[in-house]
A protein has these predicted regions:
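Short beta-strand elements of extracellular/lumenal beta-sandwich folds
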Residues: 9-36, 147-176
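A surface/secretory-pathway sequence property marking extracellular, secreted
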Residues: 35-75, 169-213, 262
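C-terminal outer-membrane/trafficking sorting elements
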Residues: 270-278, 282-347
Length: 347
């Protein structure tokens, strides 16, 4: 039973004119050892940033896209790739300003035969900031999530920095899982910057870094995911924070990461009205085109379940829906400009 998963998380967030670093985490959740040429693909807008480095040498490098092979990925094994960019300054020909949104897309193959293809692709939208707290927590899905995703996983990145003047021998990251908001039994640790022991006591989770010996100014992080309670309703919000203990010092409290479940028609999502979807109705294939580079094309049923995802890196794409039954579907297209969601009928 092959079953792969991939996530993109910020190590150093995007700031205009500065270097940003992202972590691609991929994991084998199945029971087979897996290998795949060009198995990991990562897309970004190269008009808005310049690639600086990758921690693993790419197999392929094209404008706005990077590919890697992976080999002998063992069951339950997790690996990571770090990617660094220089983000454009506000004075650049293609400027990047505070509150702009940068989109990063990662996929892992094979999607064919995978037990759960919904986590073979991850789209991370990051709001550009002017500064950041080195000890913080962030929900990667954002501040606003569709009500259709109630009961699904939310991903959290907890970052910490030794701001003291001496080496930190032991660090503990402690976070409470509110049983009204989350299902603690679903919590999974996806990745950490250093070797860690995890401990759960009641609704409190501790990530214990023993003998980490983190130098002054050194950074670390924890990436986890947990399902929101399926009893939540539209308009409800979930909150998460953490306390970080450096040796015997008073804990450093992070911010509170708040996520609200409300319709995606809110102003946080810019629309790309140039996108066209045709023919409609259709019997098999759907053409998608627009004025801006397309990133992903996703097909949903009327219950809001994701049925199909296709990567794109051009201003046009074709998605084949012939395997699905006749009826009404929704197609969500994400481009460099924004998002467009439309209804399509298969005859």
């Amino acid at each position: 039973h092959p079953d792969l998963e991939i996530v993109v998380a910020p190590v150093i967030p995007s700031r205009p004119g500065f270097e940003a670093v992202y972590k691609i985490v991929y994991r084998n959740k199945g029971n087979q050892t897996l290998s795949q040429a060009y198995g990991i693909n990562f897309f970004y807008n190269d008009n808005l940033m310049d690639l600086v480095s990758t921690s693993i040498v790419p197999t392929s490098l094209v404008s706005g896209g990077i590919s890697w092979d992976y080999a002998n990925l063992q069951p339950f094994e997790s690996r990571e790739i770090l990617v660094a960019f220089n983000i454009n300054a506000p004075t650049a020909a293609n400027p990047v300003n505070i509150n702009d949104v940068l989109t990063f897309t990662a996929s892992i193959l094979p999607q064919a035969g995978d037990e759960n293809t919904s986590d073979n692709l991850y789209v991370y939208n990051e709001v550009v900031v002017g500064s950041y707290d080195p000890n913080d927590i962030k929900c990667l899905e954002g501040n606003v999530v569709s009500p259709a995703e109630i009961g699904d996983y939310l991903h959290y990145m907890i970052r910490f920095e030794n701001t003291g003047t001496a080496e930190a021998e032991n660090i503990v990251v402690r976070t409470e899982v509110n049983p009204a908001d989350f299902d603690i039994n679903s919590l999974q640790l996806l990745n950490t910057s250093h070797p860690v022991n995890a401990k759960i006591t009641g609704n409190v989770v501790e990530f214990i870094f023993q003998n980490i010996l983190l130098e002054s100014g050194g950074h670390g992080n924890v990436l986890l995911k947990v399902k929101s309670k399926d009893t939540l309703q539209q308009g409800d919000n979930v909150n998460k924070r953490a306390n970080i203990y450096f040796d015997y010092n008073y804990p450093v409290a992070t911010n509170e990461a708040e996520t609200i479940f409300q319709a995606l028609s809110n102003p946080d999502f810019e629309q790309d009205q140039s996108i066209s979807v045709y023919p409609n109705p259709t019997k098999d294939k759907v053409n998608v085109s627009g004025d801006f580079t397309l990133q992903t094309v996703q097909l949903y049923d009327v219950q809001g379940r994701l049925l199909q995802t296709q990567l794109a890196n051009d201003n046009q794409s074709i998605i084949d829906i012939s395997v699905h039954s006749n009826g009404v579907y929704f197609i969500k297209v994400t481009s460099d400009k924004g998002i467009k969601v439309g209804k399509i009928v298969k005859e």
